[in-house]
Amino acid sequence: MAKEILVAYGVDIDAVAGWLGSYGGEDSPDDISRGLFAGEVGIPRLLKLFKKYHLPATWFSPGHSIETFSEQMKMIVDAGHEVGAHGYSHENPIAMTAKQEEDVLLKSVELIKDLTGKAPTGYVAPWWEFSNITNELLLKHGFKYDHSLMHNDFTPYYVRVGDSWSKIDYSLEAKDWMKPLIRGVETDLVEIPANWYLDDLPPMMFIKKSPNSFGFVSPHDIGQMWIDQFDWVYREMDYAVFSMTIHPDVSARPQVLLMHEKIIEHINKHEGVRWVTFNEIADDFLKRNPRKK
């Protein structure tokens, strides 16, 4: 059977928004300056990388980045890339009220429409955190796919909502928490799985307020880890989606750009590989797996 391996870069433009909403840098001029680097220097460097190898990409942008880096965002659109939603200030959906989460989503949609001329079809939850209404809001506002959950790794699926589980409460009897997870119901939202082991940020970006922040892991090690994952997928699967999550904050650094060149050139040696946008992945999945209602 011929191989069909869909490969994609998802670029999260966290920039200043990441420091405001997730990384604890909202009071640090130095950390904010790192966010400015991501938008003003990092975006053009990644665009140059994608142009060199003729690759499409999907850029998931906080609304804050769209408004703060309007010139660079226009460059992304002019290059023909897809733009998806990623919060406004990289807010944690779990921490927001239902109204706050919807207001942020609506603002994101509005900004992307103004930028690209069309509504976004895809969403990435900041910090990959899904609230108990995120799925409902995405479907309500016309989204086709999400890229935040991890029920699988290299195969898309339909998002399920309503899973429930019992947390341990040592003030109760053990029988009160010894219960299995109960699965909810499938929805129309396509999930393109997220994967912490194909994300550049945790190992290669130093965050002062994060206890598990590294920032100085060698790109040679990370690059080999990503190549090893691709090699296993190519050997074991005839159809698969291999999506990598990167950030201009991290992947626009020289040592990481060189890592990506090696990964791209390695992947391109294989037959049956196609570089695509995330929207193309979702459309391909829907054709292969029409949902039975």
Swiss-Prot record:
Keywords: Carbohydrate metabolism, Cell wall biogenesis/degradation, Hydrolase, Metal-binding, Polysaccharide degradation, Stress response, Xylan degradation, Zinc. The keyword tRNA processing does not apply. It is an enzyme of class 3 (hydrolase). It catalyses: Deacetylation of xylans and xylo-oligosaccharides. Optimum temperature is 50 degrees Celsius with acetylated xylan as substrate. Retains about 80% of the activity at 30-55 degrees Celsius. GO terms for molecular function: acetylxylan esterase activity; hydrolase activity, acting on carbon-nitrogen (but not peptide) bonds; metal ion binding. Residues 29-276 form the NodB homology domain. Optimum pH is 6.0 with acetylated xylan as substrate. Is active at acidic pH ranging from 5.0 to 6.0. Zn(2+) binds at residues 14, 86, 90. GO terms for biological process: cell wall organization; xylan catabolic process. Disruption phenotype: Cells lacking this gene are considerably less resistant to lysozyme than wild-type, and show an absence or significantly reduced amount of N-deacetylated muropeptides in the bacterial PG. Mutant strains also have attenuated ability to colonize mouse stomachs, and induce a stronger immune response in the host. Disruption of this gene does not affect oxidative stress resistance characteristics, indicating that the major physiological role of the enzyme is not in combating oxidative stress. Induction: Its expression is markedly up-regulated upon cell exposure to oxidative stress. Is also significantly induced (3.5-fold) when H.pylori cells are in contact with macrophages. InterPro entries: Glyco_hydro/deAcase_b/a-brl (IPR011330), NODB_dom (IPR002509), PgdA-like (IPR037950). Its EC number is 3.5.1.-, 3.1.1.72. Catalyzes the N-deacetylation of peptidoglycan (PG), an important mechanism that appears to confer lysozyme resistance and to mitigate host immune detection; this likely contributes to pathogen persistence in the host. The exact nature of the residue in PG that is deacetylated has not been determined. Is also able to catalyze the deacetylation of acetylated xylan, and, to a lesser extent, that of chitin and chitosan. Therefore, this enzyme might play a role during infection, considering that xylan-containing carbohydrate structures are among those commonly consumed by humans. Belongs to the polysaccharide deacetylase family. Homotetramer. This is Peptidoglycan deacetylase. The lineage of its organism: Bacteria, Pseudomonadati, Campylobacterota, Epsilonproteobacteria, Campylobacterales. The gene is pgdA.
